[in-house]
C-alpha cells in the first residue's frame, strides 16, 4: 500500500477509513414499520424491484435524501430524518437497489448504474405521488442527484450535493483501490455494515463497487457525468468539506464551474461525512437554501 499510494496517499486513506460510515444501528424494516413516532418505513415496486424508503414530515416541499456507497437512509441520514423541519418539508430517504433494505436484488455496477439509480429515484418519488422534489445527495448520491437534475429538469426543484465528483482521476482510482479489502477497515467502521449486510455481502459488494467506480477511469476524461452538468437547470448548492479525505476540492470547484448559477459553500473543518459530524450547521444550511 505504501509503495502504491505514497505518503500523502496513505494519510488520505487512513483518514478515509476513519471517516467512512459511522456506527449507526439499522433496524430491520418491514412494511410500514415505524421508527419512533415520526418516521415510517415501507417498500414500493419501482422498475421491477422493491425499493425501501423512509418518510417523515408533513410539509408541501418534498425532499429526497440520496445515500452514498453501501449506504441507506438510516445509516447515512439519521440527523436529517430526525431534525429537518417537518412542517416545511416531507423528507424521504431511499435505499438504492441492492443497498440497505432494497434487496433483493444484489447490488451490481453496470456502466450505467448511476443513470439507473437516477431513474429509480425519480420514479420512486413519482410512485409516491410527489409532483416535484428537491434532492440532497451525498457522495455517490450526489452524483445520482446531478444526473437526475440534468435528465429530469422539470421534476427537480432544488438540489444540495456534497462529496460528489463528476469524473475519476488517477488519484481517485488509487484511493478507491485502497478500500477494496474491508478486512483492513477499522472495526468501528466495519461492524455496522456487517450487521446490516452480513460480512460476505458487504465484502463482495465493496469489491464490486471499487470495480464499478474505477471503470469510469477508462472513459475519456474519466467521465461519470461531466457532460451532463451544463444541463442542470435547478438552483444548486455544492457543499464541500475542506478536510474531505476522499473527494479533493477540485471536484467541487469543477461542478460549481459547470453547473450554471450554482453556489459553493466550504466547511473548513468538514470531512466526507460533514452532514453527520456538523449536522446542525448542515441542516440549517440546507433548509435555508431549500426555502
Curated annotation (Swiss-Prot):
It is found in: Mitochondrion. Residues 1-37 form the signal peptide. Keywords: Acetylation, Hydrolase, Magnesium, Metal-binding, Mitochondrion, Signal. Its EC number is 3.1.-.-. It holds the Pfam family Abhydrolase_1. Mg(2+) binds at residue 221. The keyword rRNA-binding does not apply. Expressed at high levels in liver and kidney and lower levels in heart, intestine and skeletal muscle. SUPFAM superfamilies: alpha/beta-Hydrolases (SSF53474). Residues 62-181 form the AB hydrolase-1 domain. The record marks 140 as: Binding of alpha-amino group of substrate. It catalyses: L-homocysteine thiolactone + H2O = L-homocysteine + H(+); valacyclovir + H2O = acyclovir + L-valine + H(+). GO terms for molecular function: alpha-amino-acid esterase activity; serine hydrolase activity. Specific alpha-amino acid ester serine hydrolase that prefers small, hydrophobic, and aromatic side chains and does not have a stringent requirement for the leaving group other than preferring a primary alcohol. Has homocysteine-thiolactonase activity (in vitro) and may play a significant role in the detoxification of homocysteine thiolactone in vivo. Catalyzes the hydrolytic activation of amino acid ester prodrugs of nucleoside analogs such as valacyclovir and valganciclovir, converting them into their active forms (acyclovir and ganciclovir). PANTHER family: VALACYCLOVIR HYDROLASE. Monomer. May also form homodimers. This is Serine hydrolase BPHL. It comes from Homo sapiens. The gene is BPHL.
